[in-house]
């Protein structure tokens, strides 16, 4: 990583830096490399279906560290969360934009994205605190839900939405 970087956010197992014209997410050794590559693949797939988002540019192993980095394009702008905080009088307007973006995203399909149904099934199966009957009932409910290939952002919140300098919203 270059010395001229600005830390944007630090969460759990990652730190996000601004490199000027690019953004890099640096994951520590607790993040499986397969998850880092999967995030890059998901970015590519949502780009291909037309959702406004930064393009993945590179995945690389960190030098002198046990971790990985995902480099993406930088979308010039401000997060929706920052705008909501800075301009509380416009909170309702920003919230409406946020909801409209979620509706827009749900209008896209991407059959190659990992299916949330499969993820939830794995999660239900791993809940040792629940007895087998309860897990079975949850799986039955999950199986009864509509099967679609609509895009659903797994962590959709205003801090993950950028209001671009062009006025468009990006995820």
Model-based region annotation:
Residues 1-3:
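Juxta-kinase regulatory segment immediately upstream of eukaryotic protein kinase catalytic domains
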Residues 10-36:
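ATP-binding glycine-rich loop module of kinase domains
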Residues 34-49:
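The N-lobe alphaC helix and its flanking beta3-alphaC-beta4 segment of protein kinase-like domains
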Residues 55-68:
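Short beta-strand micro-motifs within the conserved protein kinase catalytic domain, predominantly
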Residues 65-78:
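Conserved short submotifs of the Hanks-type protein kinase catalytic core
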Residues 81-116:
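Conserved kinase catalytic-core helix
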Residues 107-154, 158-165:
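An alpha-helical support segment within catalytic cores of ATP-dependent transferases
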Residues 170-171:
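Pre-DFG segment of protein kinase catalytic domains
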